[in-house]
Structures are given as C-alpha cells and as structure tokens.
Amino acid sequence: MSESFYTYKCGHTAKYEYIKPDGAKTQSFTLVYAHGFCSDPYGRKPEEIRKWCIENGMGFFRYEIAGHGSDAARFEETTINTYKSQIFEIVGEMVDGDVVTAGASLGGWLGLLAAVQFPQKVKGFLGLAAAPDFLKKYFEAYFRPEHKEILERDGKITFPTNDFTYVITKEMIASGNENLLLDKETIPYAGKTRLLQGMKDASLDWRTAPLIAQKLTGSDVKTVLLKDSNHRLGSDSDIAEIRRALDDFLVPAVHPGR
C-alpha cells in the first residue's frame, strides 16, 4: 500500500492513499472514503472497499481526517468545518473525474456534505451508519448541566471511554450546528444513494438512515436495515451487504441483464 502525506488548506497534514481508476474502463469513478470520529481509514470496511474498487477498476481515495491518525496530536484544534474543508478540497481539487463518496458515521456526514456541495461531480453516496448532525444529538442526549457548565467555563470537556479519551470543544459543537442536514425539510442531493444501518447500533439511532432517505431529493435511494448489526458494520455478513451496495454504483454494462 502506497501512502503519502498531504498538507490541506486547513493547515493539517495527514496521510492519504489515492489509487486512480483503471484507464481501460470507459466509464469509471473514484470512491472517496471518509472514516468515523476518533477512528482511522485502515479497518476492515475500508480494506474491503479498497479491494472491491481494485477488482472493478474503480479509483479509491482514503485519508486521515484532520486531527486523527498521524495528526491526532492536533485533534483539539479541529472542528466539523475543518473536516468539511478537507473533504471539499479532496473532491473538488485532488480527485479527477466522477466521484462516489462513502462514509462511516462522521464520515457519512462529511460524504453527504460533499455530495450536496458537488452534485455534478459526486455521482453517488454510500452511507455506512452515516451520522449527520451527531454532535447536536449527542449534546442534547448526554450532556448534563454539569457537563455544560464545564464546557462553558473551560471551552472543552474530556470524555474517557474503554478504548480512548477524547475532547469535545465548544468550537466543535458550534461548527456542528453550522452544518446540520437533518433539521432541513430536504437534503438537496439527487444522486444514487445507498444507506446501510445496523439496528443494534449502540452509538446511533437506526432510524437515522430512513430519515436521511426521506429527506434526500433523489429517487434512486435504498436503505438496508441490518437487524443484528452494530455501528461498526464489520462482520462477514455486513461486508457482503456493503459489496452488494457497491455493485449498484457500477455502470449497467458491467453487469449485463441487471
């Protein structure tokens, strides 16, 4: 795997991998994969998506979101606007040709923002437990008065988990509120969309996926609810569903008779 470092206009430097489409394909796209919050682009899902792209001659672009991975030391400096600027630069300037954005959790929010921003270039969107507006929902559901007091006083609050400790800043929450999608009557994107969502997701209300589908202005939208799947969507059966969803983005000539 060939990775490089890139310094984005937002000032953050992070790793990315860009595999261009097979030149023999008359019609192709590059799938831009955005990972989840406090995660990275190297887990099973992106590896399987990468494999699918190579098998089908499609391009593949994955990257570390600012403040994550090799840039983790600068996490507290980042906001949703930082992440949005980054994916807009990737889709708008770094990747040639047509794009399908794919995102897990936070990455789904970013991929959808990019689809709305570049509707002519982004031909499709794949949401994997896509979590638009998750900061607002998290703030409303879990922030008790004492949390809000700490946030107001210190400008940030620390949350320890079993795996890691992360910091939420006032700027992060404010920027999330500047980029809400689900509070709008419609999400102005008409491209092909596939949404996969586990119904045993402990991090995200599974009804988020049907709500996204309802608000999208396009008609080629499918939502797959996986009754026994969790937020990670990393089981063998989940991966099989992801591959089936990816197949839907291939041009008809690739699968005659469909």
What are these regions (language model features)?
Residues M1-A24:
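N-terminal cap/lid segment of alpha/beta-hydrolase-fold proteins
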Residues F37-R50, R207:
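The serine-hydrolase catalytic nucleophile loop
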Residues T101-G103, L128:
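Short beta-strand immediately N-terminal to the catalytic nucleophile in serine-hydrolase-like folds
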